[in-house]
């Protein structure tokens, strides 16, 4: 490969890297609350009583996930899709890093909680699981009225 070919190749590679970096920077901003955090259905006690314990464990863990990922952030948002910029928070490197670290810490905490729950939660009474699910669901329903307090 001659010098001209090497320079051309280097130029093309640098242009691609620059384009990729700009595309990453101009990409969609991460949400304060991720889009996968939602409850598709709320339940009545009678419906929960008809479920098997394994189904209740899954519901319980999903509600824990939503609570862990939403409640610490309700001063900013109660629904997925809200970004720092949409709240008027400057989109600085420091703020993006802080959000990423918070998201990672929340994910790690949830994974550790889930690991513990998988070991210990099967020993819980079905009636306690049902009561906890109903309590968590009522808590999550209250988020729909959060804006009423502003």
PLM ranges: what are they?
Residues 22-72, 76, 150:
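Immediate post-signal-peptide N-terminus of mature secreted/exported proteins
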Residues 34, 38, 45, 52, ...:
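A generic structural signal for ordered alpha-helices
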Residues 52-63, 91-94, 98, 121-124, ...:
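Non-transmembrane, amphipathic alpha-helical segments
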Residues 68-115:
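Mid-chain, structured segments of secreted extracytoplasmic proteins
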Residues 109-150:
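C-terminal amphipathic alpha-helix
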């Amino acid at each position: 490969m001659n010098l001209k070919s090497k320079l051309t190749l280097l130029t093309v590679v640098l242009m691609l890297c620059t384009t990729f970096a700009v595309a990453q920077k101009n990409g969609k901003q991460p949400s304060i609350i991720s889009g996968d955090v939602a409850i598709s259905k709320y339940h009545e006690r009678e419906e929960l009583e008809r479920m098997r314990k394994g189904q209740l464990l899954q519901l319980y863990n999903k509600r824990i996930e939503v609570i862990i990922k939403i409640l610490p952030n309700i001063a900013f948002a109660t629904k997925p899709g809200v970004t720092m910029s949409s709240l008027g928070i400057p989109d600085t490197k420091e703020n993006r890093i802080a959000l990423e670290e918070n998201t990672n810490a929340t994910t790690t905490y949830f994974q550790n909680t889930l690991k513990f729950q998988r070991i210990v939660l099967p020993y819980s009474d079905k009636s306690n699981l049902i009561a906890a699910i109903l309590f968590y669901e009522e808590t999550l329903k209250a988020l729909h009225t959060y804006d009423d307090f502003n």
